[in-house]
Amino acid sequence: MATAAATQSQPVRVVLRVRPHLPSEANSAEAPCVGLLGSHPGGEVTVQLKDQYTSRNECYKLDAFFGQESRVCEIFDQEVSAVIPGIFEGTNATVFAYGATGSGKTYTMQGTEDLPGLIPLAVSTVLALCTGTWCSVEISYYEVYMERCYDLLEPKAREIMVLDDKDGNLQLKGLAWVPVRSLEEFHEIYSIGVQRRKVAHTGLNDVSSRSHAVLSIRITTDVVKGKLNLIDLAGNEDNRRTCNEGIRLQESAKINQSLFALSNVISALNKKEPRIPYRESKLTRILQDSLGGNSHAVMIACLNPVEYQEAVHTVSLAARSRHVTNHMSSASKQETPKDKVDMEAKLRAWLESKGKTKSIQRMDGLLSPNAIKTPLSMSHKKQSASGRVSGRGKAMDQDGGKIKKVLFDSAARIPAENFHREGTQDIVNTTKKVVLPSLTPCKEDKTGSSLRKALSPISSNMDPQKQRTADDSNCLMLLELRTPMGSCNIVGKVTGATPLDKFIALGSNLKESLIQQYLDFLNVANKEELQKLKGIGERRAEYILELREDSPRPFKSLSDLGNIGLSSKQIQDILCKTATGIFK
């Protein structure tokens, strides 16, 4: 069945919630760092963040403000309840809580038995609207932990694969959907999933969520199908304050990295960049429909009332999210023959006109139809924008980068594990020749291949060792083996050593010196100088300067670079590029 869709633009709605003081903070003399400065006729509000110690203050415009005295049910009545009727008309909606650890995100989404949060309130409303109708309600509940997805409703932890279907829509392979008929039945199922979610004690929170949790409610009727996603994001953490070690430090690094990827996506959408980095993390991949996609999205920014620096970081990202526009589409199950296009036939006709029928015949026996249709449908939607573009096509055009890529990248590396049939070399040789005439290569994406994207799941959770390129290996060799002549006095101190030992010692000293110089540079350089480094962009440079305001030397070892969202592999890659630049 094809779908008929009516599309409209809808910006992401951003509201701010300031949690009340905790019992442990009741005796604190600190005044809240955030307050409502004023409201505007169009519905906007202006909030002010003020640091009582430094007298710094910032002002931001948002869609709504809920202070410490506001209850969660007020947020639901004013913000969330408005998106629920649209689900019964075939649209999707997403509500997600964002903020630092300990800012009240999980309480906002889950609530308590006496004061239910947004999740139980939403389920109760959906079930009430389904009463006396033929609607069926199903739920799923899963978490993103250490860049892997796990089903929380299964007795045994089962990893979920994040895939794209032939139309480019996100699919979660292996995710269980459980029918729900009453609120009591929901609470019984949901409570089991909550107990399975990863939580742990940290220096800032006794029960800190160590994963992003997603509850999806799917409504199906004879005519339409809609979905509501309710997401409780894990909070970004400052490991200097949490004193995390071991596995907690690894979890924190993954959480910070995924939230940094989220800020990159929002920044790219605001700047209308041709390529949106959704695939930088599993979190941004799952939120792709909610940010710049085809879902109605509500972002609830949660704040700790006494943490100024955390509040600035949270609200600045939230304010930028307001400028992100989604493309809402209401899909109904109606046959629309005019929108059906046999893209395989169009490709064959074009190849025949160019005298390349032999290549397409070889592809027919080896590639699935989905592998061809996905990129071609994107191209066709771009070329026929005057009349045949659906809501999905317009969303793809906003994303930009995808519809400019070569069908099959001849320079791409295709791992052997993605192919499990004979004749794979013929596929690679053949597909190097097949390039659509109206498409141009995308220089930013040199490691991906359309063929790989069509045949395999996303690779954000691949083994980092497998993702290392030959260039990176060469960088490591340069870093360890080449040495300036001026450092020969270091080698002279190695007494009784063979020439090889001296050579290895020379490389080791050079490496340690480079690392220390790099850390010293991060501790003193200004914003413009930081941005000249490989791997340091504007946002990361700003965050480094923020860290230096709290501590004069925030970077004492390579592990401290995890505080700015860098993984160990990214740190290694940056040092490799730095070393390469020295020898050029």
Swiss-Prot record:
This is Kinesin-like protein KIN-10C. The keyword Nucleotide-binding applies. InterPro entries: Kinesin-like_fam, Kinesin_motor_CS, Kinesin_motor_dom, Kinesin_motor_dom_sf, P-loop_NTPase, RuvA_2-like. It comes from the Eukaryota. GO terms for molecular function: ATP binding; ATP hydrolysis activity; microtubule binding; microtubule motor activity. Residues 11-324 form the Kinesin motor domain. ATP binds at G99, A100, T101, G102, S103, G104, K105, T106. GO terms for biological process: microtubule-based movement. PANTHER family: CHROMOSOME-ASSOCIATED KINESIN KIF4A-RELATED, KINESIN-LIKE PROTEIN. The keyword Nucleus does not apply. Belongs to the TRAFAC class myosin-kinesin ATPase superfamily. Kinesin family. KIN-10 subfamily. PROSITE patterns: KINESIN_MOTOR_1, KINESIN_MOTOR_2. Residues 377-398, 445-469 are annotated as: Disordered. The gene is KIN10C. GO terms for cellular component: cytoplasm; kinesin complex; microtubule. Keywords: ATP-binding, Microtubule, Motor protein, Nucleotide-binding. The lineage of its organism: Eukaryota, Viridiplantae, Streptophyta, Embryophyta, Tracheophyta.
